A protein has these predicted regions:
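Conserved donor-nucleotide/metal-binding helix-loop-beta segment in metal-dependent transferases, i.e.
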Residues: 196-227
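Active-site-proximal specificity loops/subdomain of glycosyltransferases
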Residues: 126-185, 199
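A recurrent flexible, glycine/aromatic-enriched loop bordering the glycosyltransferase active site
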Residues: 186, 227-241
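Conserved nucleotide-sugar donor-binding
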Residues: 197-198, 235-254
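C-terminal catalytic/acceptor-binding lobe
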Residues: 2-3, 32-50, 69-70, 263, ...
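Short, acidic, metal-binding catalytic loop of nucleotide-sugar glycosyltransferases
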Residues: 85, 89-92, 112-123
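Acidic donor-binding/catalytic loop of UDP-sugar-dependent glycosyltransferases
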Residues: 107, 184, 191-205
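N-terminal signal-anchor transmembrane helix specifying type II single-pass membrane topology
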Residues: 2-74
């Protein structure tokens, strides 16, 4: 390995276990007769270069070879040497979370909120439209609640949309009245069903100067939604962030602004319209996910953008993200828990190939979630596109979407991957102090479509039962280097 890249690029190792008379798993480079594979780690910035080049994968990308080396293009190594260290790093103590909800919906949605909320470690509020029922006890596992003091009925249009739009102002005014308010840098706003990944939110915010005026979020996944509403708004279910200076300015002008935009449909458009009057435009972070999708979002999670996973929304309306769990809350809890082992690497995609007599495999790892094995060659450009396992949010149409997709045709089973979902994860620290993670994935045995393929390459691959992936814990500061590419 080139010395200049050695501190940045690590190796993924994947151990493939077989269903056979001799059940003991082995590595392919120990015995050629076994169907094993060494998968190399493609760091996010390496993957960016891999996808942006029109040349072939093996010439310009980072790849595995028979000597277990990682080869890195010279132009990438030069970029990786950049020093992006920023002093006075942001941490959770600098963030206030504002959760928009209602007395009617909170009990239904709070299981998702409580997957990520940490009492005593985080600062924020759930904003309700009225006091919760008198005979109920507010759970200690939830953020503390406040009742909005804003009389939204005095403003035309939807009063609930106006109230939700004002969550950032309510949060700002509440925290400014408390000791230590000078330490607050950012306000993170979401819905009651939004699942956030706090460590990744912190890592993302450390790319930005908190003293500047920022409005950070992401757009919808469905074109029909963005055309109907806007390409320049941060969708609130995905969550969005404003810097303290933006929140302060909104506190001075929000009420009058909401009156000016009372004709707009929802809270997201109203927030964006008011922020635009400050001369601040949306900074897009693709790790925020509104999830304006229906059915099964497997494809989106298995080919995540090259960005930290920041949020997921609309989960209650979707199929469980893993077939290993009966309910969506259980499935999402599994993802949240594995993310705590290596937040920055969660859902990051690694791609590798194994070509030798009798084996022609393409492998895609979505760390902490799934492994796909294709018993054929599939280009990295195609593997980077999510499988279209979902439909649009409003009309359940097969697109268009605001990102590239690969169609899924059940009648062409031999083109589909074998999919292994996360079973368990653990971390261990070596003698040198380096932390690595071990994640194990097992195949979805109920996938009858895959079993219908009669090609010999698929029949051999169907012997695989589990995949174990080893990876060094990713440094969250590496995300700063992605922006320099």
């Amino acid at each position: 390995m080139h010395s200049r890249a050695k501190g940045i690029l690590e190796k993924f190792q994947a151990l493939f276990s077989l269903r056979s008379e001799e059940s003991r798993p082995r590595w392919f480079w120990v015995r050629r007769s076994l169907y094993g594979l060494l998968v190399c780690s493609l760091f996010p910035f390496t993957y960016l270069v891999l996808l942006s080049d029109e040349t072939t994968f093996l010439r310009q990308g980072t790849f595995c070879d028979s000597t277990n080396r990682i080869t890195t293009p010279v132009h990438l190594r030069d970029r990786l040497s950049l020093d992006s260290t920023v002093p006075f790093a942001t941490d959770l103590s600098h963030i206030v979370f504002g959760i928009s909800s209602s007395a009617e919906t909170w009990d239904r949605e709070r299981p998702y909120n409580e997957l990520w909320w940490r009492p005593g470690e985080m600062h924020g509020y759930v904003w309700l439209d009225e006091e919760p029922p008198a005979d109920s006890t507010w759970p200690s596992t939830s953020p503390p609640y406040r009742v909005s003091t804003f009389n939204a009925s005095t403003i035309g249009g939807s009063s609930s949309a106006a109230q939700i739009a004002r969550t950032v102002v309510e949060s700002y005014k509440a925290v400014m009245a408390e000791p230590g308010s000078r330490e607050i840098r950012w306000f993170v706003i979401g819905d009651d069903g939004t699942v956030l990944f706090p460590e990744n939110v912190v890592a993302m915010l450390n790319k930005y100067d908190h003293e500047e005026m920022y409005y950070i979020g992401s757009i919808s996944e469905s074109v029909e939604q963005t055309v109907r509403h806007s390409y320049s708004i941060a969708y609130g279910g995905a969550g969005f962030v404003v810097s303290q200076s933006v929140a302060a300015e909104l506190a001075l002008m929000m009420d009058g602004c909401l009156e000016r935009y009372a004709n707009l449909y929802g809270s997201d458009e109203r927030v964006q319209s008011c922020i635009s009057e400050l001369g601040v435009i949306l900074t897009i972070e693709p790790g925020f996910h509104q999830v304006d999708l229906q059915d099964d979002i497997y494809g989106l999670l298995a080919a995540h953008p090259v960005a930290p996973l920041l949020s997921l929304n609309h989960l209650r309306h979707l199929k469980p993200i893993s077939p290993h769990w009966e309910t969506q809350v259980e499935a999402v809890k599994s993802l949240v828990e594995v993310s705590q082992h290596d937040p920055s690497r969660t859902l990051q995609q690694a791609i590798c190939y194994e070509h030798r007599p009798g084996v022609n495999w393409s492998v895609s790892v979505s760390w902490g979630y799934s492994v796909e094995v294709y018993p054929q060659h599939v280009s990295s450009k195609e593997l980077a596109k999510p499988l279209m396992t979902f439909r649009t949010w409003r009309t359940r149409s097969p697109g268009p979407f605001t990102f590239d997709v690969r169609p899924v045709d059940p009648n062409r089973a031999c083109e589909l991957p074998l999919i292994f979902f996360l079973d368990q994860a653990k971390s261990e620290t070596g003698r040198n102090g380096i932390i690595r993670t071990i994640t194990e994935y097992s195949r979805n045995m109920t996938d009858s479509v895959i079993s219908s393929c009669k090609l010999q390459s698929y029949i051999k691959a169907l012997e695989l039962e589990t995949v174990t992936v080893y990876a060094t814990k990713m440094n969250p500061d590496d995300w700063k280097r992605v922006t320099s590419l």
